[in-house]
Amino acid sequence: MSLMLEPNPTQIKEERIYAEMGLTDEEFAMVEKILGRLPNYTETGLFSVMWSEHCSYKNSKPVLRKFPTTGERVLQGPGEGAGIVDIGDNQAVVFKMESHNHPSAIEPYQGAATGVGGIIRDVFSMGARPVALLNSLRFGELQSPRVKYLFEEVVAGIAGYGNCIGIPTVGGEVQFDPCYEGNPLVNAMCVGLINHEDIKKGQAHGAGNTVMYVGASTGRDGIHGATFASEELSESSEAKRPAVQVGDPFMEKLLIEACLELIQSDALVGIQDMGAAGLTSSSAEMASKAGMGIEMYLDDVPQRETGMTPYEMMLSESQERMLIVVKKGREQEIVDLFEKYGLAAVTMGKVTEDKMLRLFHKDEMVAEVPADALAEEAPIYHKPSKEAAYFAEFQQMKMETPKVEDYKETLLALLQQPTIASKEWVYDQYDYQVRTSTIVTPGSDAAVIRVRGTEKGLAMTTDCNSRYIYLDPEVGGKIAVAEAARNIVCSGGEPLAITDCLNFGNPEKPEIFWQIEKSVDGMSEACRKLQTPVIGGNVSMYNERSGEAVYPTPTVGMVGLVHDLKHVTTQEFKQAGDLVYVIGETKAEFGGSELQKMIYGKIFGQSPSIDLDVELKRQKQVLAAIQAGLVQSAHDVAEGGLAVAITESAIGAKGLGATVKLDGEATAVLFAESQSRFVITVKRENKEAFEKAVEAIQVGEVTNTNEVTIHNEENEVLLTANVDEMRKAWKGAIPCLLK
């Protein structure tokens, strides 16, 4: 589009062109009032992206304020590229999770790949070296050819980017439910390490300092990507492929090294990734956070397409680009540094005192807007909220235990449900050992990486059972945080903090907004109780296809500190003769369970209950026992219940099984999904010390029979399962469905 064809301010108003960009009538009137005149085409574009839900959180801010965001270890909470938590010895961990759902629904390979690239930039823009990646994925049922295609391409995109850039993808989760058929969820998380003195902020301080553009050149890809992410998917979304960016991991690898070297220089004042809304968000936010203004000369923007307009340059979401502010007079050092890595570094503006964002192109001023108006003054909406119609009905249901004829066959079938089955097909495509710091690889409760030069480790996980949250958003929200912490504890880590990715449907629907409010209430309560503040995250709304929303899916990414690598614990049995313990009571809780879904083909009723005081007490006891060296293996009891958890601990070992006795109604003790439960094994000589430290019931022992045998309280055999047969079924389920 050439400048001649852009509508003038009067046309923008009269023909409601602003509405096509995503602004409402009221918002356009606000823009007019802020500027004291009608905005031109470029200015309308700036407001439309910065005031989109994706950039401004205008529909979710009132809810997000409920999260606890401070703690004695928190060095940086929400508001910067990523959050930062102190881990002692002048070191800190930097982490964040973000969604790339809409792009991945349209162009799954590039959508997923650029999601990984974007989250990596958020972490190294803080000054940290990225050391690990995780992801949380949701798809429809694998029987559908379209879902198979999305699944295969998303995984390939994550692998393609992560492997090329040389950062290990160490963990995550994949779940399958029909509601994600048309709108998959792709949440990517990056974890980095930093020394305290290297922490950088995305702020443009110092009038007269120089604004520079570094990294890849700008094209027309991703224009209005932030607006695209703030609307529902529909049949016409396929036509929006141009809105999906294309990533170059090799360019990003060079960009990481160049930026980390730059951060060691005292020439750098501020640095920010050009993410959603590209140059617009990075310039407006850096100026606004510093209480300054910025002038930019768009003729100097490196462009890989001809005839780009100011509108296109400002709204492009081309990848692998950063905006930096450097001390005046030090520009040549920066150019030389980036040249060494084969990258462009171009002076394109300066910091001003008057808080305005001014853009010049071809010797003309093409936009003049207060930086705060873009970055901070988006309208905040308190959307109407209404309890979902299904909720009261589910709460009143009398829950019956699903009928199970053959316990062994049921266990075998559960192990083949894609949500429970081995994800080896997924993580075998990821290089999870690159950088040689990975101590616990994918497949256990949490991944663990070594903090080099110390005896410490970082445990990390992503968790969210969206079925529970659909049935009861508040309780489900508590469970998501509690399960993440349980996974960290089972790996020998002390839970530190969380990042979240709130994936929901259209917030303008009162029942969806109710889901958002309630799940955040539950998560906030759990974060306070477990002392894991929220240090950052992302909101992804409008996850709907043809009016049908996905399950509410507020994914939790949690990092924990392993104080000594001797404490690292995994889920698989270690040796025959070890004693098997179960911590926690089992109730007949089947709402949202894998068994319920498998037998009835749908979920209904009440989600499992959770008592956060009990959860905290058990986690503290288990962690103390692990740190005292009393625990051989630890596994949290999740999808599929105790029978699945015990079998998973046997599958991970070689040639080991277990004989256990479980009291209570058979279907419940085997397959119910009650919360706050662990399966722990302990050496026989540690029996007394362990039982003194932890409230647990010894249920049996690890055997070298390669069989899992479970008895009831009358000592009748409920099931005997050959571990090799179970492993084969569990490992083969996903590859079999993809054939």
From Swiss-Prot:
<feature type="binding site">
    <location>
        <position position="98"/>
    </location>
    <ligand>
        <name>Mg(2+) 1</name>
    </ligand>
</feature>
<dbReference type="InterPro" id="IPR010074">
    <property type="entry name" value="PRibForGlyAmidine_synth_PurL"/>
</dbReference>
<keyword id="KW-0436">Ligase</keyword>
<feature type="binding site">
    <location>
        <position position="122"/>
    </location>
    <ligand>
        <name>Mg(2+) 2</name>
    </ligand>
</feature>
<feature type="binding site">
    <location>
        <position position="537"/>
    </location>
    <ligand>
        <name>ATP</name>
    </ligand>
</feature>
<comment type="similarity">
    <text>Belongs to the FGAMS family.</text>
</comment>
<feature type="binding site">
    <location>
        <begin position="99"/>
        <end position="102"/>
    </location>
    <ligand>
        <name>substrate</name>
    </ligand>
</feature>
<keyword id="KW-0547">Nucleotide-binding</keyword>
<comment type="function">
    <text>Part of the phosphoribosylformylglycinamidine synthase complex involved in the purines biosynthetic pathway. Catalyzes the ATP-dependent conversion of formylglycinamide ribonucleotide (FGAR) and glutamine to yield formylglycinamidine ribonucleotide (FGAM) and glutamate. The FGAM synthase complex is composed of three subunits. PurQ produces an ammonia molecule by converting glutamine to glutamate. PurL transfers the ammonia molecule to FGAR to form FGAM in an ATP-dependent manner.</text>
</comment>
<dbReference type="InterPro" id="IPR041609">
    <property type="entry name" value="PurL_linker"/>
</dbReference>
<feature type="active site">
    <location>
        <position position="54"/>
    </location>
</feature>
<feature type="active site" description="Proton acceptor">
    <location>
        <position position="100"/>
    </location>
</feature>
<dbReference type="GO" id="GO:0000287">
    <property type="term" value="F:magnesium ion binding"/>
</dbReference>
<comment type="subunit">
    <text>Monomer. Part of the FGAM synthase complex composed of 1 PurL, 1 PurQ and 2 PurS subunits.</text>
</comment>
<feature type="binding site">
    <location>
        <position position="57"/>
    </location>
    <ligand>
        <name>ATP</name>
    </ligand>
</feature>
<dbReference type="InterPro" id="IPR036921">
    <property type="entry name" value="PurM-like_N_sf"/>
</dbReference>
<dbReference type="InterPro" id="IPR036676">
    <property type="entry name" value="PurM-like_C_sf"/>
</dbReference>
<feature type="binding site">
    <location>
        <position position="245"/>
    </location>
    <ligand>
        <name>substrate</name>
    </ligand>
</feature>
<feature type="binding site">
    <location>
        <position position="538"/>
    </location>
    <ligand>
        <name>Mg(2+) 1</name>
    </ligand>
</feature>
<feature type="binding site">
    <location>
        <position position="500"/>
    </location>
    <ligand>
        <name>ATP</name>
    </ligand>
</feature>
<feature type="binding site">
    <location>
        <begin position="317"/>
        <end position="319"/>
    </location>
    <ligand>
        <name>substrate</name>
    </ligand>
</feature>
<keyword id="KW-0067">ATP-binding</keyword>
<keyword id="KW-0963">Cytoplasm</keyword>
<dbReference type="InterPro" id="IPR010918">
    <property type="entry name" value="PurM-like_C_dom"/>
</dbReference>
<dbReference type="Pfam" id="PF02769">
    <property type="entry name" value="AIRS_C"/>
</dbReference>
<dbReference type="InterPro" id="IPR016188">
    <property type="entry name" value="PurM-like_N"/>
</dbReference>
<dbReference type="Pfam" id="PF00586">
    <property type="entry name" value="AIRS"/>
</dbReference>
<feature type="binding site">
    <location>
        <position position="96"/>
    </location>
    <ligand>
        <name>ATP</name>
    </ligand>
</feature>
<feature type="binding site">
    <location>
        <position position="121"/>
    </location>
    <ligand>
        <name>substrate</name>
    </ligand>
</feature>
<dbReference type="GO" id="GO:0005737">
    <property type="term" value="C:cytoplasm"/>
</dbReference>
<dbReference type="GO" id="GO:0004642">
    <property type="term" value="F:phosphoribosylformylglycinamidine synthase activity"/>
</dbReference>
<dbReference type="Pfam" id="PF18072">
    <property type="entry name" value="FGAR-AT_linker"/>
</dbReference>
<protein>
    <recommendedName>
        <fullName>Phosphoribosylformylglycinamidine synthase subunit PurL</fullName>
        <ecNumber>6.3.5.3</ecNumber>
    </recommendedName>
</protein>
<keyword id="KW-0658">Purine biosynthesis</keyword>
<dbReference type="GO" id="GO:0006189">
    <property type="term" value="P:'de novo' IMP biosynthetic process"/>
</dbReference>
<feature type="binding site">
    <location>
        <position position="273"/>
    </location>
    <ligand>
        <name>Mg(2+) 2</name>
    </ligand>
</feature>
<comment type="pathway">
    <text>Purine metabolism; IMP biosynthesis via de novo pathway; 5-amino-1-(5-phospho-D-ribosyl)imidazole from N(2)-formyl-N(1)-(5-phospho-D-ribosyl)glycinamide: step 1/2.</text>
</comment>
<dbReference type="GO" id="GO:0005524">
    <property type="term" value="F:ATP binding"/>
</dbReference>
<keyword id="KW-0460">Magnesium</keyword>
<feature type="binding site">
    <location>
        <position position="540"/>
    </location>
    <ligand>
        <name>substrate</name>
    </ligand>
</feature>
<keyword id="KW-0479">Metal-binding</keyword>
